Amino acid sequence: MTADKEKKRSSSERRKEKSRDAARCRRSKETEVFYELAHELPLPHSVSSHLDKASIMRLAISFLRTHKLLSSVCSENESEAEADQQMDNLYLKALEGFIAVVTQDGDMIFLSENISKFMGLTQVELTGHSIFDFTHPCDHEEIRENLSLKNGSGFGKKSKDMSTERDFFMRMKCTVTNRGRTVNLKSATWKVLHCTGQVKVYNNCPPHNSLCGYKEPLLSCLIIMCEPIQHPSHMDIPLDSKTFLSRHSMDMKFTYCDDRITELIGYHPEELLGRSAYEFYHALDSENMTKSHQNLCTKGQVVSGQYRMLAKHGGYVWLETQGTVIYNPRNLQPQCIMCVNYVLSEIEKNDVVFSMDQTESLFKPHLMAMNSIFDSSGKGAVSEKSNFLFTKLKEEPEELAQLAPTPGDAIISLDFGNQNFEESSAYGKAILPPSQPWATELRSHSTQSEAGSLPAFTVPQAAAPGSTTPSATSSSSSCSTPNSPEDYYTSLDNDLKIEVIEKLFAMDTEAKDQCSTQTDFNELDLETLAPYIPMDGEDFQLSPICPEERLLAENPQSTPQHCFSAMTNIFQPLAPVAPHSPFLLDKFQQQLESKKTEPEHRPMSSIFFDAGSKASLPPCCGQASTPLSSMGGRSNTQWPPDPPLHFGPTKWAVGDQRTEFLGAAPLGPPVSPPHVSTFKTRSAKGFGARGPDVLSPAMVALSNKLKLKRQLEYEEQAFQDLSGGDPPGGSTSHLMWKRMKNLRGGSCPLMPDKPLSANVPNDKFTQNPMRGLGHPLRHLPLPQPPSAISPGENSKSRFPPQCYATQYQDYSLSSAHKVSGMASRLLGPSFESYLLPELTRYDCEVNVPVLGSSTLLQGGDLLRALDQAT
């Protein structure tokens, strides 16, 4: 029994030994086969001898697939193959990247040996592995799109459907540091690779070896060259003369540019700062550059293809740009974009204009020649060269269109000295009947000889110290300024004169004297003043802060200057107008000659409220033409002129009693100072349907005074009924009794000589309408001899702007109690001897009658309405 057991045990052990020996033999044979297979790989012996079986299998399969690809694509000519073998080492040295062959499934079947130089990973470590194991997960979808072969037209972009070429960017793991050291794969960083190549299609086996007559599907692989993008801070090789650096914001606006761009493309670095790089790309390359910009923002680095950048003086150059996003080391946020620009060619098609920036060089030589016209300082030379300039621009209309202003630019009027090119007005004169020339027309004829001798481009002259006319309306300026709104229209169809309006906006609007500057300041203050409502029943308004009050207090004998107003800006004359226009004077002289007797005195109501009167009350002051820009962008309300007031001819027939104020002087036709200009009288009916109902501030003030008079007369009658006609007691009642007495006797106290408001005419006749109508006007200025009149002035504008500049005295209060200025009016008593309420700008804006003066609340009615509302 024991012998049998030993035999069985020995047999099993023998079988085990045999199996172990067989396995050992198989492993040795397998190792021998793998060893032989490893030696068959195109690898050095030092590398292949240390490979494990899995690596040998992976590399062998990759080699076989690569060999099949090469055999189906490349030629079998050995001579060419030998030449390629000799050039292999030179290729790798010349390339700035490595070669990779990736199958449709993503397996990297071939990688060049120099991959370790750029990525740190060796060829053996990566060959046979999937590309998705070493690339960024966000790039996998893009990699799959580039690996697949699209046959249908409904897939992807048209460019990929029609071509097998590929150009994309991917991020791959890199184990080499900036200093050249190699780290572990777990510590690897992402490096952007620019992959360019094409898709190759090949068969898996020859057609005659196909199984059962079925053809195997076509195999495709992607052959690409991967070029890593070098970081700008790690460039060791200095840039050549055909390369320049630039820094941009994240939206590709220039923040820095190298000086080399000037000699390469023509731009100066200062011209590019703040401008987008898209402004200088060729239109056909803008789509590719937009895609490159998107890749740059998503992946951090990009290399643009060859694109065209427009040169400054026409044409373009071919460029290639490497862009890198610089991140903030603190918060890892993108900070800017650094670009290395390689100029690949010279300027091509430099005679072709591709953008508006390149048009400057075409006109610059001509413009420089034109600028030389104005180098000479002589008047004759300027006149001749200005004619040459007009002829030059007329011959070249394209150049004239280039010099035309764009919307928003200032309009600068060009005056060529002699007006030989103006449109003739014979057409309008042939239709309209001849009329008597106005004063402005006579003046234009008298100054025509002087205008011909002026230079082509004149500088506005400063006005005289006593003149309130801006320099744009002086006689020394070559620009003719309209004096009335009718001058802005032609005589045929009342169309606006374009050339006159252009001159209006082109003239110098700066104030030349101190009065106009201070007046603008006062108008600014008026905007912030609140209306003053007294509590004692007397509705007197505050007067604006005018600098003339201080001047009048110091020099009572001097003629007060007029405050300018913002109510008359463009549609009012630019200078103070003579109170008695020649048209008005001629009219009254004709009436006096026809009657030969002194007419009867009309009642006050008929004088001031005659709606059908054609004579207008001469305004005391005008307004300088000031555009909105000089007022700080504030809107300036344009007001129509006051309705005409009719004065009786008797006010003008008493010229023999004027020697009392100024002394004796020879009689003659009255004249106006040189700064006074006349204008054609406008009718108040030309401003809408309001017509005669529109009252001027002076007329409103007069009506208020008449109401006050009636109220005081009623109170006086009440006092007489109570006290039997004796003056009532008390200071307030005593003053009221004095006022009623003065009103009854016709010798009411007048206001001190100061301007009531910037918008109310400072006319003593309107301030004292209750004066006896039979009293002569004794304070009219004497006429000047004809020799004192300047030849350029109008012979018909005679009267000075202030015919009633009389220094009246207030007899109701002593000089110590006379108040002046804003502070004194606030602190002083409200029963001051002002019988004419002062109107401010707010009164004129709020109390403008709309349908008639009868619908407005005034005085006590207004106070009662306000009390009921509150």
Swiss-Prot record:
Enumerate the UniProt keywords alphabetically.
Activator, Angiogenesis, Congenital erythrocytosis, Developmental protein, Differentiation, Disease variant, DNA-binding, Host-virus interaction, Hydroxylation, Nucleus, Phosphoprotein, Repeat, Transcription, Transcription regulation, Ubl conjugation
Spell out the residue ranges making up region: CTAD: 830-870
- Presence of keyword Membrane: no
> Gene3D superfamilies given for it?
Helix-loop-helix DNA-binding domain, PAS domain
Q: Biased-composition ranges for Low complexity? A: 462-485
How would you describe the post-translational modification of this protein?
Answer: In normoxia, is probably hydroxylated on Pro-405 and Pro-531 by EGLN1/PHD1, EGLN2/PHD2 and/or EGLN3/PHD3. The hydroxylated prolines promote interaction with VHL, initiating rapid ubiquitination and subsequent proteasomal degradation. Under hypoxia, proline hydroxylation is impaired and ubiquitination is attenuated, resulting in stabilization. In normoxia, is hydroxylated on Asn-847 by HIF1AN thus probably abrogating interaction with CREBBP and EP300 and preventing transcriptional activation.
State the Gene Ontology BP annotations: angiogenesis; blood vessel remodeling; cellular response to hypoxia; embryonic placenta development; epithelial cell maturation; erythrocyte differentiation; lung development; mitochondrion organization
Under Pfam families, the record lists: bHLH_HIF1A (PF23171), HIF-1 (PF11413), HIF-1a_CTAD (PF08778), PAS (PF00989), PAS_11 (PF14598)
* Entry GO terms, CC: chromatin; cytosol; nuclear speck; nucleoplasm; transcription regulator complex
Q: Where is this region: DNA-binding?
A: 26-53
Domain named bHLH is located at: 14-67
Quaternary assembly:
Interacts with HIF3A. Efficient DNA binding requires dimerization with another bHLH protein. Heterodimerizes with ARNT; heterodimer binds to core DNA sequence 5'-TACGTG-3' within the hypoxia response element (HRE) of target gene promoters. Interacts with CREBBP. Interacts with EGLN1. Interacts with VHL. (Microbial infection) Interacts with Kaposi's sarcoma-associated herpesvirus/HHV-8 protein ORF34; this interaction results in increased stability of EPAS1 and thus activation of its transcriptional activity.
Q: Which disease is it linked to?
A: Erythrocytosis, familial, 4: An autosomal dominant disorder characterized by elevated serum hemoglobin and hematocrit, and normal platelet and leukocyte counts.
**Function according to Swiss-Prot or TrEMBL:** Transcription factor involved in the induction of oxygen regulated genes. Heterodimerizes with ARNT; heterodimer binds to core DNA sequence 5'-TACGTG-3' within the hypoxia response element (HRE) of target gene promoters. Regulates the vascular endothelial growth factor (VEGF) expression and seems to be implicated in the development of blood vessels and the tubular system of lung. May also play a role in the formation of the endothelium that gives rise to the blood brain barrier. Potent activator of the Tie-2 tyrosine kinase expression.
Q: What name does this protein carry? A: Endothelial PAS domain-containing protein 1
Task: Supply the source organism for this entry.
Answer: Homo sapiens
